[in-house]
Curated annotation (Swiss-Prot):
Keywords: 2Fe-2S, Aromatic hydrocarbons catabolism, Dioxygenase, Iron, Iron-sulfur, Metal-binding, NAD, Oxidoreductase, Plasmid. [2Fe-2S] cluster binds at C81, H83, C101, H104. Fe cation binds at H208, H213, D362. Residues 39-137 form the Rieske domain. InterPro entries: RHO_NdoB-like_C, Rieske_2Fe-2S, Rieske_2Fe-2S_sf, Ring-hydroxy_dOase_2Fe2S_BS, Ring_hydroxy_dOase_asu_C_dom, Rng_hydr_dOase-A. GO terms for molecular function: 2 iron, 2 sulfur cluster binding; iron ion binding; naphthalene 1,2-dioxygenase activity. Component of the naphthalene dioxygenase (NDO) multicomponent enzyme system which catalyzes the incorporation of both atoms of molecular oxygen into naphthalene to form cis-(1R,2S)-dihydroxy-1,2-dihydronaphthalene. The alpha subunit has a catalytic role in the holoenzyme. Its EC number is 1.14.12.12. The naphthalene dioxygenase (NDO) multicomponent enzyme system is composed of an electron transfer component and a dioxygenase component (iron sulfur protein (ISP)). The electron transfer component is composed of a ferredoxin reductase (NdoR) and a ferredoxin (NdoA), and the dioxygenase component is formed of a heterohexamer (trimer of heterodimers) of three large alpha subunits (NdoB) and three small beta subunits (NdoC). This is Naphthalene 1,2-dioxygenase system, large oxygenase component. PROSITE patterns: RIESKE, RING_HYDROXYL_ALPHA. One of its GO terms (biological process) is catabolic process. Its cofactor is [2Fe-2S] cluster; Fe(2+).
């Protein structure tokens, strides 16, 4: 199918065709236009601190080796032997000077170069040009305050430009907190859902919390417990939503809402964060310092999500149109007491890990919504994301990006899917930029006409 003129998402991101969650042909197109073009999360500095340290990660449906080099830099390569295509590294993580294929024994350095071939002189003579047979390298690897992302496309904007307005909201936590650590290895589980279903849920959906998580809310003591069953709405001014040019966005829930998913840790988290916020008020200003202590439910387009303060860090690795492998890490602040780090990491797996009770709540929604996207009658129906439409602003004096000043809305949905439509209808970054030249004007319309 030619997707160049195929409207899967309406202008302003108000509706999406249900088939985007279930169509296998479209999924293959996404691998070319989304996974091969955008910045994808690989790992964190804290997981590969020393030369020779490596992890394996996913970029779309491809697996890569991410390795710390002898000079401290980080490079990434397809986890595929150049001889006969076997998977090179089976371990999730380790430390090695190089990698040897278990099929025919070809050996590659941690820099990706082909270094040794059994019986090279006897079998190949002078015909083997090892310089041309190194591992295929990921074109771009960059860091956002220790969080490492890779991109196959040389024409992509820098990682910082790609994050765009979303970076301003993330930096109080990722940078000014004193730094973060990622606790691995990740918990992994396969769900029968399209990768976009969890990505959109985490991009800023506070609307579902009272219904979907009613039973979970009732199990603990937190400021969010009163929302069980949508008994009450969050008070006016409880938060905001934002989105950016390249699709990354989030919901922000101010102040005391931060510890909802780790209810038993709320007193410790509030005490730890409160002391640091006082310092940050002076260093970076009241609003960024308030963001540091608030709860951000964010998706970095396309498939990396984080719940700050709750310590939840997700990667939604696509397998096919209706299957996703979910990787769940915990994020902790570097200067947290070790006991608090451990307990927060445990709380992440208990709530949003493979068997977490909040995770289980969400998975049923995501799976059935995705599976219905491939059914004959429902696939061409429109899914709606018009909550708060007409109230969003761009160019706010304080808050960057397109902003909806309500805790509950779908501002970030619309921005996510506007970027998605621009990518699937574009052949390259230049075409995406042309399609996005009026992005904030589209998203701040007051009418759908």
């Amino acid at each position: 199918m030619n997707y160049k003129n195929k409207i899967l998402v309406s202008e302003s991101g108000l509706t999406q065709k249900h088939l985007i969650h279930g169509d296998e042909e479209l999924f293959q197109h996404e691998l070319r236009t989304i996974x091969a073009r955008n910045w994808l999360f690989l790992t964190h500095d804290s997981l590969i601190p020393s030369p020779g340290d490596y992890v394996t990660a996913k970029m779309g449906i491809d697996e890569v080796i991410v390795s710390r080099q002898s000079d401290g830099s980080i490079r990434a390569f397809l986890n595929v032997c150049r001889h006969r295509g076997k998977t090179l590294v089976n371990a999730e993580a380790g430390n090695a000077k190089g990698f040897v294929c278990s099929y025919h024994g070809w050996g590659f350095g941690s820099n990706g170069e082909l270094q040794s071939v059994p019986f090279e002189k006897e079998l190949y003579g002078e015909s083997l040009n090892k310089k041309c047979l190194g591992l295929k390298e990921v074109a771009r690897v960059e860091s956002f305050h220790g969080f490492i992302y890779g991109c196959f496309d040389q024409e992509a904007p820098s990682l910082m430009d790609y994050l765009g307005d979303a970076a301003w909201y993330l930096e109080p936590i990722f940078k000014h907190s004193g730094g973060l650590e990622l606790v691995g290895p990740p918990g992994k589980v396969v769900i029968k859902a399209n990768w976009k279903a969890p990505a959109e849920n985490f991009v800023g959906d506070a609307y579902h919390v009272g219904w979907t998580h009613a039973s979970s809310l009732r199990t603990g003591e937190s400021i969010f417990s009163s929302l069980a069953g949508n008994a009450v709405l969050p008070p006016e001014g409880a938060g905001l939503q934002m989105t950016s040019k390249y699709g990354s966005g989030m919901g922000v829930l101010w102040d005391g809402y931060s510890g909802v998913h780790s209810a038993d840790l709320v007193p410790e988290l509030m005490a730890f964060g409160g002391a640091k916020q006082e310092r940050l008020n002076k260093e970076i200003g009241d609003v960024p310092a308030r963001i540091y202590r608030s709860h951000l439910n964010c998706t970095v387009f396309p498939n990396n999500s984080v719940l700050t303060c709750s310590g939840v860090f997700k990667v939604w690795n696509p397998i096919d149109a209706n299957t996703t492998e979910v990787w769940t890490y915990a994020i902790v602040e570097k200067d947290m007491p070790e006991d608090l780090k451990r307990r927060l990491a445990d709380a992440v797996q208990r709530t949003f890990g493979p068997a977490g009770f909040w995770e289980s709540d969400d998975n049923d929604n995501m799976e059935t919504a995705s599976q219905n996207g491939k059914k004959y009658q429902s696939r061409d129906s429109d899914l709606i994301s018009n909550l708060g439409f007409g109230k969003d602003v761009y160019g706010d004096a304080v808050y960057p990006g397109v902003v909806g000043k309500s805790a509950i809305g779908e501002t970030s949905y619309r921005g996510f899917y506007r970027a998605y439509q621009a990518h699937v209808s574009s052949s390259n970054w230049a075409e995406f930029e042309d399609a996005s030249s009026t992005w904030h004007t589209e998203l701040t319309k007051t009418t759908d006409r």
